[in-house]
């Protein structure tokens, strides 16, 4: 499949697609939520697998990738953009909004507010990438919503890379996840934030490891609802039916395509993204 060039911007209408991107497959968890909430919407998905993991990259690099991908989706005529990556949101969403002030844009951020409201022990755990945990955006969330609770943060190097291979159950990922969960349980966390869009795919495994009293919180459903609000406010809700989702990958497209069925996705034609 040849590289897909950036086209000239198209005037988006109600039936134009929504662009969704992540550093890899993690944003597919958000894509699932969007499909459930907005079944009439046609979707474009770009996995920047050639530059994963974002969580270990510099903010400057992530900003550059965010703007390149935003330009691409804008050129494809997307009527809205979902930054389905916590790290990319923390580093780059403000820059995208500055470039496209009239474009409906939804970002991700760890669910600090609902977690602080849900905890009974007063101790909240956060599983996230290093980039998210070190961001000014995350620090601001803690200052704003978590002043009355204790927050235990746990960076999770290696998890994203394993999930990218479709590995959700192997002994290797079990051992790694157990290592990251144990400090949170030792600190009496009764509410754990999944602060990376890859991590909802590990919910079944986490349920095996955690007491039933521990609540897991992610923001995929909230992002879908926010997208619904923005599209409704702009008069851009689609009447349907939704067209097949189009996928792009900045790595070898066939590799991404083989993983889709493992992550509850219909197999699809994956195109090459080389920018």
Swiss-Prot record:
Q: Name one GO biological process term.
A: regulation of cell shape
Supply the PANTHER family for this chain: GLUTAMATE RACEMASE (PTHR21198:SF2)
Reaction catalysed?
A: L-glutamate = D-glutamate
Domain of life of the native organism = Bacteria
Protein name, entry field: Glutamate racemase
Q: Which residues bind substrate?
A: 22-23, 54-55, 86-87, 197-198
Q: Which SUPFAM superfamilies match?
A: Aspartate/glutamate racemase
Q: Which residues cross the membrane?
A: none
Family from the record: Belongs to the aspartate/glutamate racemases family.
Q: Which GO terms describe its molecular function?
A: glutamate racemase activity
Main role?
Provides the (R)-glutamate required for cell wall biosynthesis.
**Which source organism?**
Pseudomonas syringae pv. tomato (strain ATCC BAA-871 / DC3000)
Quote the catalytic residue positions.
85, 196
EC code: 5.1.1.3
Enzyme class, first EC level, given as a word:
isomerase
Signal sequence extent: none
> Pfam families this protein is in?
Asp_Glu_race
- InterPro entries for the chain: Asp/Glu/hydantoin_racemase, Asp/Glu_race, Asp/Glu_racemase_AS_1, Asp/Glu_racemase_AS_2, Glu_race
Q: What keywords is this UniProt entry annotated with?
A: Cell shape, Cell wall biogenesis/degradation, Isomerase, Peptidoglycan synthesis
Name its pathway: Cell wall biogenesis; peptidoglycan biosynthesis
């Amino acid at each position: 499949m040849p590289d897909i060039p950036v086209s000239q911007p198209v005037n988006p209408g109600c039936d134009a697609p929504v662009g969704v991107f992540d550093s890899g497959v993690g944003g597919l968890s958000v894509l699932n939520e969007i499909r459930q909430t907005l079944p009439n919407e046609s979707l474009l998905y770009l996995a920047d697998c050639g530059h994963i993991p974002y969580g270990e990259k510099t903010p400057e690099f992530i900003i550059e990738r965010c703007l390149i991908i935003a330009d691409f989706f804008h050129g494809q005529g997307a009527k809205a953009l979902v930054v389905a990556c916590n790290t990319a949101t923390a580093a780059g969403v403000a820059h995208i909004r500055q470039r496209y002030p009239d474009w409906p844009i939804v970002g991700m951020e760890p669910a600090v507010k609902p977690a602080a409201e849900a905890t009974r022990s007063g101790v909240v755990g956060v599983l996230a990438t290093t980039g998210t945990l070190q961001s000014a955006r995350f620090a601001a969330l803690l200052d704003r919503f978590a002043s009355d609770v204790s927050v235990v943060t746990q960076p999770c190097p290696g998890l994203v890379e394993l999930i990218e291979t479709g590995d959700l159950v192997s002994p290797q990922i079990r051992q790694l996840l157990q290592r990251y969960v144990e400090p949170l349980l030792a600190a009496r966390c009764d509410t754990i934030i999944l602060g990376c869009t890859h991590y909802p795919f590990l919910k079944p495994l986490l349920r095996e490891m955690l007491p039933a009293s521990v609540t897991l919180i992610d923001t995929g459903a909230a992002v879908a609802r926010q997208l619904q609000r923005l599209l409704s406010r702009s008069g851009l809700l689609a009447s349907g039916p939704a067209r097949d989702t189009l996928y792009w990958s900045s790595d070898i497209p066939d590799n991404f395509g083989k993983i889709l069925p493992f992550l509850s996705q219909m197999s699809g034609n994956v195109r090459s993204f080389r920018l």
